[in-house]
């Protein structure tokens, strides 16, 4: 790789890192491309060399988070389906909490009120969360942990409803609701009930 290519990769990564920082500080809707390039110390035109618009760079951030979670799952690839799901839920909630409660509230409000680009932002997150969860469940079917007739799409909807409900309750309670404790309780009390009927007997 040439020095020019290395510099291009560094600039692209800097734009990604800065965008993620700024979203955590001020939210997506108030963030402008000018804010990003000013913080990154590059010309505004530089942004468009790597990304077409603000939504595209956020999509890339989501992809990177997806990859980070997948790497953590790969580290416990020999663990059972319950342990993998609990790790995924833990990563899910901690990532949401890293954006601070006022930012998550703004995001939820934007989706409810259908603010500019809010539908696309909500869809992006839902698609990536759904894909990650499906991959975990499909792998469990292939490994004979879950039965071949496991209703994966239905289970994904049930589980994601629980996860999204947790960070919604966190916002509604002004932070008094503890999402991490809720995840732990969900894993210990509800999860086996939800997927228990589809687990192979030898794996229960």
Residue ranges and their predicted role:
Residues 51, 57-65:
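Alpha-helical DNA-contacting segments of helix-turn-helix folds
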């Amino acid at each position: 790789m040439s020095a020019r290519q290395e510099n291009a990769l560094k600039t692209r990564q800097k734009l990604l890192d800065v965008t993620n920082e700024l979203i955590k500080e001020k939210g997506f809707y108030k963030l402008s491309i000018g804010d990003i390039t000013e913080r990154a110390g590059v010309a505004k035109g530089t942004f468009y060399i790597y990304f077409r618009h603000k939504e595209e760079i956020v999509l890339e951030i989501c992809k990177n988070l997806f990859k980070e979670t997948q790497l953590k799952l790969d580290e416990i690839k020999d663990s059972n389906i319950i342990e993998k799901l609990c790790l995924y839920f833990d990563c899910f909630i901690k990532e949401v909490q890293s954006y601070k409660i006022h930012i998550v509230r703004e995001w939820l409000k934007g989706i409810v009120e259908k603010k500019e680009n809010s539908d696309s932002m909500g869809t992006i997150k839902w698609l990536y969360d759904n894909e990650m969860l499906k991959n975990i469940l499909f792998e469990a079917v292939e490994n004979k942990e879950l039965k071949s007739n496991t209703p994966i799409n239905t289970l994904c909807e049930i589980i994601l409803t629980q996860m999204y409900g947790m960070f919604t309750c966190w916002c509604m309670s002004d932070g008094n609701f503890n999402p991490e404790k809720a995840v732990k309780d969900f894993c210990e009390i509800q999860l086996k009930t939800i997927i228990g009927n589809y687990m192979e007997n030898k794996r229960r």
